[in-house]
């Protein structure tokens, strides 16, 4: 008999962890196994249909929250339950570490590859570990961890149903880049490549969704060989992305900052794009934004490193194979890759000049993601991996 599952992080539709929790909960509800939510779900950040399905879980959440409040800082052991804990780099748990079950499973997508004795000790307290990339699983195997579960994240095909282009960007060749600004995401590489590409193709337009809910974490991008400084933080607490792009030689008429995109906006924006670029230095999972672009039928350029390798198939994207090592003085960046600006420019030019080949690539990518990388498939394999 299956144990009850307890999700200890916040469900939402605004970031990866929230989506992992939400789609796991929806799957469990379909299996008539409602999960216990230890954290209050962010219902305001859910589409109405999903909100309606999650709301009935609030009653049990409020009961466990009241018990937790009465217990103060004590460990809460939930007998007969499997507790899933979301872990950060270094296997650092959040406040939910106080919830433990008959089985406690650690869920992680990590980019920091340094494993000292303290990290290994924290990892060993879990009855099982589940990751979201072959890259992470292999790194754990090197450290002696066996039986690590693997579940690939995905997309919701209904949410990303094909929509016709609106023509909002006119006759421009539109390049999309998404993901919060930080060193490992490689927005500096995007700017360097786009600046050169636009010199060849003056009708090119870079459309970005780079805002970072934790703007101070963007400071590390100053380590880049392509940029002298990170974007400034404005008085409103948001990154001054347009100014940063201008400082890198991208003219105002070739750059649009879309701000923070809502889930309902993604498909419509991507319908007007001709390419999506992801020269990321590292992905602990498989890059949700890249999969969304593929699902919407946009030809995608992907760095061939870390978690991206689980997305790359023959013909379904244009991989950036020229990968150089990223400086790694302390062993925290094993497997990270520095993409070639020149190769990225070449791939963009190929998509520009051969639209038929671009369409074939887009269709291969769309078929792959919609067939093999859905949230439904993720949730099924995730629950199996947990149990």
Question: What are these language model-derived features?
Answer:
Residues 6, 168-185, 191-198, 206-210:
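Conserved donor-binding/catalytic core segment of Leloir-type glycosyltransferases
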Residues 6-8, 47-141:
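Extended catalytic core of nucleotide-activated donor transferases of GT-like folds
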Residues 117-118, 155-172:
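Acidic anion/phosphate-binding donor-loop and adjacent secondary structure
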Residues 127-138, 145-162:
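Donor nucleotide-sugar binding/catalytic pocket of nucleotide-sugar-dependent glycosyltransferases
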Residues 219-264:
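Nucleotide-activated donor-binding/catalytic signature segment of Leloir-type glycosyltransferases, i.e.
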Residues 268-285, 298:
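Acidic donor-binding loop of glycosyltransferase active sites
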Residues 299-302, 316-319:
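Short hydrophobic beta-strand element within catalytic cores of glycosyltransferases
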Residues 339, 343-344, 352-384:
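A charged, aromatic-enriched C-terminal amphipathic alpha-helix characteristic of glycosyltransferases
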């Amino acid at each position: 008999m299956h144990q009850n599952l307890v999700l200890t992080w916040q469900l939402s539709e605004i970031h990866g962890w929230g989506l992992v929790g939400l789609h796991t909960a929806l799957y469990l509800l379909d299996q008539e196994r409602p999960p216990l939510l230890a954290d209050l779900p962010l219902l305001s950040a859910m589409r109405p249909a999903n909100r309606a399905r999650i709301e009935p879980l609030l009653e049990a959440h409020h009961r466990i929250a009241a018990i937790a409040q009465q217990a103060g800082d004590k460990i809460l052991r939930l007998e007969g339950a499997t507790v899933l804990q979301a872990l950060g780099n270094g296997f650092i748990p959040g406040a939910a570490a106080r919830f433990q079950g008959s089985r406690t499973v650690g869920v992680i997508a990590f980019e920091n590859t340094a494993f000292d004795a303290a990290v290994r000790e924290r990892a060993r307290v879990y009855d099982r570990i589940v990751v979201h990339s072959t890259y992470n699983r292999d790194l754990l195997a090197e450290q002696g961890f066996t039986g690590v579960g693997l579940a690939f994240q995905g997309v919701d095909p209904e949410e990303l149903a094909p929509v016709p282009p609106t023509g909002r960007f006119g006759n421009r060749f539109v390049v999309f880049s998404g993901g919060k600004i930080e060193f490992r995401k490689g927005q500096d590489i995007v700017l360097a490549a786009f600046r050169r590409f636009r010199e060849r193709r003056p009708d090119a337009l870079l459309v970005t969704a780079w805002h970072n809910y934790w703007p101070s974490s963007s400071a590390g991008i100053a380590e880049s060989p392509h940029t002298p400084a990170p974007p400034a933080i404005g008085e409103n607490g948001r990154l001054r992305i347009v100014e940063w792009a201008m400082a890198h030689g991208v003219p105002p008429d070739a750059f649009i900052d879309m701000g923070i995109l809502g889930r309902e906006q993604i498909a419509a924006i991507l319908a007007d794009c001709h390419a999506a670029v992801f020269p990321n230095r590292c992905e602990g999972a498989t890059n949700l934004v890249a999969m969304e672009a593929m699902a919407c039928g946009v030809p995608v350029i992907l760095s061939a490193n870390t978690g991206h390798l689980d997305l790359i198939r023959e013909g379904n994207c244009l991989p950036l194979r020229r990968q150089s090592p990223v400086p790694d003085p302390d062993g925290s960046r094993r497997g990270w890759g520095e993409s070639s600006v020149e190769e990225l420019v070449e791939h963009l030019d190929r998509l520009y000049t051969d639209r038929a080949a671009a369409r074939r690539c887009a269709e291969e990518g769309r078929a792959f993601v919609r067939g093999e990388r859905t949230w439904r498939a993720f949730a099924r394999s995730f629950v199996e991996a947990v149990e």
